[in-house]
Amino acid sequence: MTAHIDPLDLAKALIAAPSVTPATGAVFDVLEGALTPLGFTVERFIDGIEPDGPVENLLAVRKGAGPKHFGFAGHLDVVPPGVGWTGDAFVPEVRGDLLYGRGAVDMKGAIAAFVAAAAATPSDAGTLSLIVTGDEEGPAVFGTRALMEHMDARGIRPDMILVGEPTSVNRLGDMVKIGRRGSVNIWIDVPGTQGHVAYPHLADNPIPKLVRILSAIDSVSLDAGTDWFQPSNIEFTDIEVGNGATNVIPASARARLSIRFNDRHRGAELVAMVERIAQDVEPRAKVVGKISGEAFLTPPGELSELVAEAIAAETGLTPEMSTTGGTSDARFLHALCPVV
């Protein structure tokens, strides 16, 4: 037995429920209202405390007779509307064959499409689940990772997961992400002794030391890439000394860098490398890293072939399998099963 859900109507209803990170309440009511009549058991959780919470999360499961469990992961939160909107970003509007509204692409439209597909799937087929968070665009501390803990406590483990992030480049369906690079942000603090520029012998200027540290880091070539990943890259993103005077040697200097790395590296190893370089120049230098996610790869196989066949059937395109771009919650979910 199957049902019918119009994905456009559902997408419009989701867009019409404002859900800037962290999303809670009304937008989850809309999704739950669509899933319950389809036979899904829906659980909603409030996870976390300030400053990164509370966050609402939703886990919906419809058990089937088939042997496979197919999961869909997504997020209902959106980034705040920027300038340039010609109307209310939370009032969905169809112009021609395009749907406009905050979250239409990332990713309320994808969630609506999957719910419509689930409605059209016989209830006696394999098990379907939706893993939906209210915090993917923000800190993501109490989002998908918290949902994974709920799943583990309930013994829920999909065989494969599709993440509904937009990955197309020029045409819908032209690219599928089968992996993502890891990401780590690193802060370097170099201490010194404040003083007057006329008396440098009474001060200890941290800026030349920081410059030497950054120069040494800049000379590092992490790798030449792999079969599936582009070369890892180090980018300096900020330098600050907090010095508004022209005649004062600052007491400290700080820099921030970001590393996007492939699966030849681990985040902690890169933080340790930067720390060694910094302390070779200044033993008192402090290095702190924040790993957003490790690199992962889902080698081409059953899941990517299934997705490619579905795309080809609907669009006539053969999608490119890629690992380019930024991170997504797939960086957490790959620990459960193959994910694209």
Language model features by range: what are they?
Residues M1-A3, P80, T167-R171, I178, ...:
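Metal-dependent amide/peptide-bond hydrolase catalytic core
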Residues M1-P81, S252-S258, L270-R276:
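N-terminal helical capping/dimerization or prosegment-like subdomains
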Residues M107-G179:
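Acidic/histidine-rich catalytic neighborhood of metal-dependent amide-processing enzymes
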Residues V42, A60, P92-V94, F236-I239, ...:
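A structural signal for short hydrophobic beta-strand segments in well-ordered beta-sheet cores
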Residues A13, A116-P122, R212-S219:
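Short glycine/serine- and small hydrophobic-enriched flexible loop segments
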Residues T41, L99-D106, A198-P206:
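Short alpha-helix boundary/capping segments
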